[in-house]
A protein has these predicted regions:
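Ordered alpha/beta subdomains of enzyme catalytic regions
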Residues: 1-231, 333-457
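Glycine-rich phosphate/ribose-binding loops and adjacent secondary-structure elements
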Residues: 212-370
């Protein structure tokens, strides 16, 4: 019997997280000795629904992948079974990334057509990274943005309530749940319910109890007493299994009988704003934690209804970014070395609706009095206003410096979002943040467009 496979990626198979056409092209490039230096840009064309900005995330996983991106024996055996040539597989056995990477720091707010990552390397090496880079940066940026919007709501309309990711069980797979927990922390959450994210990334973990705990005992009182006897002052009780208000009163009675100061109670159903006020009246010294269907919209509605909460536990809406489930990032060739022309030459697509800006870029962010005013998208070698957001992170295959801590990244997000114009932060009808195209890049784009159109005539 063939053993079942859970579907884990390992360092030995990580390089196979690539669409087949990447390997098809690699084999062709090497067979034709077509290995010029090339540059690729990873960016998104449009903001997702109701988004005024995107929080860049996932760079650390990109860099971790580059650290160990090799074709192990298991990967090579599989590719041989798939019909790839022996000479090609021999070359893959010695694969390692030797190029350069520039990127915007995680936690930076970004806008359409601005590179989040730029890669310069021999064409086969840069090409191989497409699927993996898009997967890691696109998904985490989507979730970090969703989380940042929730954090912004509780900062602007609440009291800075605690936010905990409860969404791993509803995520689209184990890797999605794990990376969503990290991205939520990057976006400003305080922790996650997922232990694996605590172990892998150091994200603080939180947990209370499930309805099954309460239901497993003969009575609600016995379930509360058993929990309180086990966890004492650390106890947070789920009080809505049968009747929320009665559950709150019972929780108070059990705590007093046991001589315990309850840490808090959790509400997971019903008219949460109304019930939270009734619970707070009965348990004024206990934290009230609210879950069930939470996102930036329901949290804002809860707060505007004068609900009482010390924390929220968003789940499905967070880990799936339910209202805007796709960022659709792209990874496009923007420059390539051409024989006889000297150095990298800018390249672009002319497809309808998918025109790209050619060449490597700089993204200048112009600020005034600590607030972001506008960005300028320009050529990499072009002088321009504002600080360039793209920083070297890998040079000749080696990391340039140590990565920031997760807490430092989280602070970068907080600082970036607060620096945006208030209208851009609106969660339903955000204003447009201005991104200007430099004169040099505009001229380069028009020059290359004209040349390509003439070539096709």
């Amino acid at each position: 019997m063939t053993p079942s496979s859970f579907g884990h990626l390992t360092p030995e198979t990580l390089a196979l997280f690539a669409d087949r056409y990447e390997l098809t092209m690699l084999q062709g490039y090497l067979a034709r000795e077509h290995t010029p230096e090339a540059a690729f840009s990873l960016y998104f064309r449009d903001l997702p629904r109701n988004r005024g900005y995107v929080v860049a995330a996932g760079l650390e996983q990109v860099l971790a992948a580059l650290d160990s991106l090799t074709f192990g024996e298991r990967a090579l055996t599989y590719l041989a079974e798939e019909g790839f040539d022996d000479d090609f597989l021999d070359s893959l056995a010695d694969f390692s990334f030797s190029g350069d990477v520039r990127a915007v720091p995680e936690g930076t707010v970004a806008f359409p057509n601005e590179p989040l990552v730029e890669v310069r390397a021999p064409l086969p090496e840069a090409q191989l990274l497409e699927t993996l880079f898009l997967n890691q940066v696109g998904f985490q940026s989507l979730v970090a943005t969703k989380a940042a919007r929730m954090r912004d709501v509780v900062e602007r309309e609440g009291d800075g309530q605690t936010l905990v990711d409860f969404g791993s069980r509803r995520a689209h797979g184990t890797d999605a749940g794990l990376k969503a927990a990290r991205a939520a922390y990057v976006g400003g959450f305080d922790g996650t319910s997922l232990l694996a994210a605590g172990e892998a990334f150091g994200v603080p973990t939180y947990g209370t109890m499930a309805h099954s705990w309460v239901q497993s005992f003969p009575t609600e009182r016995e379930s509360f007493r058993a929990f309180v006897d086990t966890y004492g002052d650390e106890s947070t009780l789920l009080i809505d299994t049968y009747d929320t208000v009665a559950g709150a009163e019972l929780a108070g009675e059990v705590a007093r009988e046991a001589g315990v100061d309850l840490r808090g109670v959790r509400l997971d159903s019903g008219d949460l704003a109304t019930l939270s006020k009734e619970v707070h009246e009965r348990l004024p010294d206990a934290d009230v934690f609210v879950s069930s269907g939470m996102d930036e919209y329901t949290i804002r509605e809860f707060l505007r209804s004068d609900g009482v909460a010390d924390g929220f536990g968003p789940g499905t809406a967070l880990t799936t970014s339910r209202d805007a489930p796709s960022l659709d990032p792209v990874y496009k060739l923007v420059a390539v070395e051409r024989e006889g022309e000297g150095g990298l030459q800018p390249s672009m697509k002319l497809s309808s609706g998918k025109v790209t800006y050619p060449g490597e870029k700089r993204v200048g962010r112009v600020e005034a009095d600590g607030a972001y005013v506008h960005d300028v998208l320009g050529k990499r070698d072009e002088a321009g206003p504002g600080r360039d957001l793209l920083e070297p992170v890998v040079r000749a295959g080696e990391r340039v410096s140590a990565s920031p801590t997760l807490d430092e990244i989280r602070e970068t997000t907080r600082r970036n979002v607060r620096s945006l114009p208030p209208a851009v932060r609106d969660i339903e009808e955000p204003g447009t943040y201005e991104v200007r195209v430099s004169d040099g890049l505009a001229a380069e784009t028009e020059r290359l467009r004209t040349r390509l159109e003439r070539r096709e005539e």
